[in-house]
Regions:
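Boundary-proximal intrinsically disordered activation/regulatory segments immediately upstream
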Residues: 1-67, 155-156
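RNA substrate-binding interface of SAM-dependent RNA methyltransferases
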Residues: 4, 80-82, 107-201
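Glycine- and other small-residue-rich loops at beta-strand/loop junctions that grip anionic moieties
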Residues: 6, 36, 126-127, 152-153, ...
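Amphipathic alpha-helical repeat scaffolds
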Residues: 40, 129-137, 250-255
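Short, aromatic/basic amphipathic alpha-helical patches
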Residues: 66-77, 231
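A glycine-rich helix N-cap at a beta->alpha junction
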Residues: 74-93
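Structured adenosyl-cofactor binding patch, chiefly the S-adenosyl-L-methionine
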Residues: 100-102, 140-144, 153-172, 229-271
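Active-site/ligand-binding-proximal alpha/beta "capping" segment
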Residues: 195-247
Length: 271
């Protein structure tokens, strides 16, 4: 494969790593041409394991025969760009990439109907906009037995660079889809919706009624404001996590991990 040493981030072929915004990388008008940036050898290898197609690679020159060597072999005949650490360090978040980045073709996502048809436990993210939280939620969901994620169209893109990085590549492992329908529509797929919210009629996360449900969609709200009243009112269950020391709630990423752990156990019990 061709290896090109660069001395400027304005070099041909490097704009995808340096100039293009996450919005431009997504390419809504032509999604088949969308691009994802995987950062660090671990995340790149996860993406390759999940079948993503590499477009080009950017790394420090010293990694050509080091951390990037096996990745270069796996990627086949794609352009490889190398530069000094001093040059590449000007890339946003570069210190977290371990010196290796890969531009990859954005994979096609299933429809929410397709995802629901194959799932028993899903998470619905309603207007969750923080990229760090998205990445952390996906990592917990993948690790704790959730089958997939549905995101309202005003949520952050899971393939945002920071979300990919925080998720440690699990955004490529966990099936996800955009949800462009009202939450009650999920009942048509056999799901009971579980809104995570503090309300007078909230039940505990370990309530026996939840254990009896074969298909559950746990609904998490945006940072700060939580779920809108309409989403809570439309839910089949309103659920809270018991707290101590007067603390009323957890960050959405932390709350999701607790919910996934409990619901993952319940899923095993209903198999």
């Amino acid at each position: 494969m061709p290896i090109t040493e660069i001395h400027s981030l304005d070099a041909a072929g490097v704009a995808v790593y340096h100039r293009l915004t996450d919005h431009q990388l997504r390419n809504r008008l032509h999604p088949e041409d969308g691009t994802v940036i995987a950062e660090s050898p671990k995340v790149i290898n996860v993406a390759l394991d999940e079948g993503l197609l590499p477009i080009s690679l950017l790394c420090e020159a010293r990694h050509i025969e080091g951390d990037a060597a096996d990745i270069i072999k796996r990627c086949g005949d794609i352009p490889v760009y190398t530069g000094s650490r001093e040059l590449l360090a000007s890339l946003t978040g570069y210190t977290l990439t371990r010196g290796v980045l890969c531009a990859m073709r954005r994979p096609q996502q299933p429809t929410w109907q397709e995802l629901c048809g194959k799932s028993r436990r899903v998470v619905v993210l309603d207007a969750v906009c923080d990229t760090t939280n998205i990445g952390a939620i996906f990592r917990s969901a993948a690790a704790l037995g959730i089958d997939g994620a549905l995101l309202t169209t005003d949520s952050c893109d899971p393939f945002n660079r920071r979300a990919v990085r925080v998720s440690m590549g699990t955004v490529f492992k966990l099936p996800w889809a955009w949800l462009d329908a009202p939450l009650p529509t999920l009942r048509e797929c056999g799901f009971k919706t579980v809104a995570m919210a503090l309300r007078h009629d909230s039940i505990a996360l370990d309530d026996p009624r939840l254990k009896a449900e074969p298909r559950i969609a746990v609904v998490m709200g945006t940072e700060g404001d939580g779920l809108p009243t309409e989403a809570i009112d439309d839910a089949d269950y309103v659920v809270k996590i018991p707290m101590a020391r007067g603390v009323d709630s957890l960050n959405v990423a932390a709350a999701s991990a607790v919910a996934f752990w409990e619901l993952g156990k319940q899923k095993a019990q209903t198999l």
